[in-house]
A protein has these predicted regions:
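A helix-coil-helix interface module used to build multimeric assemblies
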Residues: 15-217
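Cationic, amphipathic, low-complexity segments that mediate targeting or membrane/lipid association
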Residues: 2-6
Length: 217
């Protein structure tokens, strides 16, 4: 049986120089329309803080089990923290050609610290995306829940300040009976409370670590 031809061209090697994901099998970059269609950095850059936190934890773990040396792990963590400082200060240049927040941060990390190329050991990109999304959602739920509690407190204060005010209660677009304005406001407090309970339930579902699941688990 004839052996399959061996590709000797640099562009055919699986090892790629480009930091763009999935670029190893292609000799040139995507067309402009394809690049615009597949990029997500325009909206997923909001995950940068959680992506860095996950990478810092992963680097620390790799250093702990000996995949990275202690010195490498420390240098990677320092580089990730410095990248976070630059983003916070508005000094980070997001590159749309790198497609998403993960590749942007990974490219900058390996530029600053060559040992950063080892960081993805034992971690699927799918793990990383799921982790970032869950951490971001967790923070958003906490913030929204706090805002709802503030709204409830404001409604209670307003109800207490108007405990003797009477307003018409409507049914079928007609005035049906007199009701206390305070009772009307407190009804909304209870409605918001049910929304808070739903958020807290969502938090318990989101607050699960997906690391180690890989692409297909």
């Amino acid at each position: 049986m004839e052996s399959p031809p061996t590709c000797r061209k640099t562009s055919c090697r699986m090892k790629k120089a480009s930091p763009v994901s999935r670029s190893g099998r292609f000799s040139s970059g995507p067309g402009e329309d394809a690049a615009k269609f597949t990029e997500s950095i325009s909206f997923d850059r909001r995950l940068w803080r959680h992506d860095l936190m996950g990478s810092i934890a992963h680097a620390t773990m790799l250093g702990g089990i000996g995949v990275l040396t202690k010195a490498e792990a420390k240098r990677i963590v320092r580089a990730l923290e410095a990248i976070g400082d630059d983003i916070e200060a508005g000094r980070f240049d997001w590159d749309e050609s790198l497609e998403d927040v993960h590749m942007n941060l990974e490219a900058e990390l390996t530029r600053r610290e060559p040992a950063g190329a080892k960081l993805h050991t034992g971690r699927s990109r799918n793990d990383q995306v799921a982790l970032d999304t869950r951490m971001w959602l967790r923070d958003e739920i906490v913030d929204l829940e706090e805002e709802l509690r503030s709204l409830q407190q404001a409604l209670v204060v307003l109800a207490q300040a108007n405990d003797d005010v009477i307003i018409p209660g409507y049914t079928h677009l007609q005035r049906a009976q007199p009701v206390y304005f305070a009772h009307h406001l407190l009804a909304y407090v209870e409605m918001v409370e049910r929304d808070r309970e739903r958020l807290l339930d969502a938090f318990s579902r989101v607050n699960v670590c997906p690391l180690g699941s890989g692409a297909l688990a």
